[in-house]
From Swiss-Prot:
Modified residues (Phosphoserine): 45
Amino acids binding O2: 62
Main location class: cytoplasm
Name of the protein in question: Leghemoglobin-1
Subcellular location: Cytoplasm, Cytosol; Nucleus
Gene3D superfamilies associated with the record: Globins (1.10.490.10)
Residues where Nitrated tyrosine is found: 25, 30, 134
Expression (tissue specificity): Root nodules.
SUPFAM superfamilies: Globin-like
């Protein structure tokens, strides 16, 4: 069974909830990542020289890009059944030394952030849709 129209709609609608407070959710997202993988801090140019996770234009832009890429993955999975990356998105992850465990940490942070943004709209079905979309993106990044 492919990615369904309902799954795509769930990802799209909840990604809009993230956009309602991107500063707060961006800080939450990276805080969760660094709690789980403190050494990942050096992989992010906008975090490596800071004392902690603080809101900044670069942090917010990167978080919005990550969540946007997962949303775009949902669209691609629904349309074609696979995720194809644009440009250098895959190679930059290889250059930064991103390994399989990092993808697991980011997935967990992504789901916790969307859960927070979704509030009472959160469900197992919503979680599953984000997981499938993220896994499709992660697979494409690893294959690049």
């Amino acid at each position: 069974m492919g990615f369904t129209e309902k799954q795509e709609a769930l990802v799209n609608s909840s990604s809009q909830l993230f956009k309602q407070n991107p500063s707060n959710y961006s800080v939450l997202f990276y805080t969760i990542i660094l709690q789980k993988a403190p050494t990942a801090k050096a992989m992010f140019s906008f975090l490596k020289d800071s004392a902690g996770v603080v809101d900044s234009p670069k942090l917010g832009a990167h978080a919005e890009k990550v969540f946007g890429m997962v949303r775009d993955s949902a669209v691609q999975l629904r349309a074609t059944g696979e995720v194809v990356l644009d440009g250098k998105d895959g190679s930059i992850h290889i250059q930064k030394g991103v390994l399989d465990p990092h993808f697991v940490v980011v997935k967990e942070a992504l789901l916790k952030t969307i859960k927070e943004a979704s509030g009472d709209k959160w469900s197992e079905e919503l979680s599953a849709a984000w997981e499938v979309a993220y896994d499709g993106l992660a697979t494409a990044i690893k294959a690049a």
